[in-house]
């Protein structure tokens, strides 16, 4: 993370506080440095969630292989670390942008809502999580003047839902 900040990147995807030996180690000083920067952070937490759901569903249908059991255990620990990490980064004030990696591995197309819900689970309010999936990506790409919010003169795709996503993000799946 520090090397990326030193290099002057605009965004970091799949940001994680892992040491070279693979052990998880959150570093508040680095988190504060990231929060003070103009760098956008894309956690892509939904990808790990999709893998855990897939393996849990398999486990309910049949006995998992040893490899699958090990992957589920690693993914569960990684997911817990990721949620704790991004919760701490939200508290530090890091600029989060939603991104899903959908279509890769076990993450299906059409479930960007899962990433928004993951951002909410990490500590963003429902509206902040929605912004992280709409306004923030446009701002991160430098195209907020033409997309990212519903305003006169801007292009927009609208999702009409049965409910109030500021109260319940689950209605984004309607």
Regions found by a protein language model. Give the residues of each.
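Active-site core of metal-dependent hydrolases
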Residues: 1-80, 92, 97, 102-104, ...
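His/Asp/Glu-enriched, well-ordered alpha-helical/loop segment
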Residues: 67, 79-164
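Short, intrinsically disordered, charge-balanced linker/junction segments flanking boundaries
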Residues: 169-174
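Conserved protein kinase catalytic core
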Residues: 20, 107, 168
């Amino acid at each position: 993370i520090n090397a990326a900040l030193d290099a002057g990147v605009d965004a970091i995807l799949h940001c994680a506080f892992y040491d070279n030996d693979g052990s998880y180690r959150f570093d508040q000083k680095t988190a504060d440095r990231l929060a003070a920067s103009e760098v956008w952070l894309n956690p892509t937490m939904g990808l790990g969630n999709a893998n855990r759901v897939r393996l849990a569903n398999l486990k309910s249908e049949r006995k998992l292989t040893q490899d699958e059991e090990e992957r589920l255990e690693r993914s569960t620990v990684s997911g817990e670390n990721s949620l704790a990490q991004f919760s701490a980064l939200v508290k530090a004030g890091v600029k989060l942008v939603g991104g899903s990696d959908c279509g890769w591995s076990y993450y299906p197309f059409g479930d960007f809502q899962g990433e928004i819900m993951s951002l909410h689970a990490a500590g963003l309010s429902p509206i902040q999580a929605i912004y992280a999936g709409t306004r923030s990506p446009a701002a991160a790409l430098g195209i907020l003047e033409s997309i990212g919010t519903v305003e006169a003169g801007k292009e927009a795709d609208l999702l009409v839902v049965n409910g109030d996503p500021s109260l319940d993000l689950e209605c984004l799946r309607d």
